[in-house]
Amino acid sequence: FGSGTVIWGKKGTAPQNFARNNGNPFAALMSYPDVPEGIWFYNEVKYGYDNGIMTGTSDGNFGPYNALPRCQFAVILHRLAGGETVPFEQRYPDVADGMWYTDAIMWASEAGIISGYSNGYFGVADNITREEMATMMYRYARYKGYDTGARADFDQFLDGNKVNDFARKPMSWAVGCGLISGKYGQTVLDPQGQASRAETAIIIMRFMENIRPAAEVSSVSLDRDRIE
């Protein structure tokens, strides 16, 4: 193969090693059985896969319709930030040292991006809601120094008055800048509804392409997500 020939294959396999050793461009093949080409979230899932931001579950699938636990979203944001290591502190009774999500939660807590509940727990396995995700994305954008000035009026949504106070500004920003859109013909926000993994992939790609400055976008190679 010439040095300009694109080598296709799965990550971590012989084709990737060949491309690396011979200076060829490498294009990763995504092979989730539950994410066929042409499905409405395929491009976003592949974007997350290619950039090492959001990968599959332990059974080899992506789990697009599965709800996303809070600990997994902490891991995703940690990947976006480059995987900074923060010393462990016993901040939450349900976050032990040495777990696959511990570093991410320590970092996100230290950065003020994710906080626990009023009872002191983090809620590791609790499924993240749409308004919680908007809030964490908003805090992450502020942490990175990105523009968070966009705003949207909730009056266009039938349930706009159901957004909790803590999430009103973040949700207004997320809708205003196009990260989160309404459901059922743009009629409802569903703020307390659970965010699926497919929806999360879409939101992350929108953030990376439209909010995060293009010069900062880089691939991050990290371990796959896990479902506990």
Task: For each feature predicted by the language model, list its residue ranges.
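Ankyrin-repeat and related helical/solenoid repeat scaffolds used for protein-protein interactions
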Residues: F1-G4, F157-V163, G176
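Solvent-exposed loop and capping/linker segments of extracellular ligand-binding repeat ectodomains
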Residues: F1-M30, Y47, W107
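Feature responds to low-complexity, polar/acidic, surface-exposed segments characteristic
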Residues: L29-Y42, N51, T55-A104, A111-E131, ...
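Alpha-helix C-terminal capping/helix-coil junction sites
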Residues: Y49, S109-E110, V175
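Alpha-helical membrane segments in multi-pass integral membrane proteins
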Residues: N164-G176, A201
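Acidic helix/loop microenvironments that form the catalytic cleft of cell-wall polysaccharide enzymes
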Residues: A195-E199
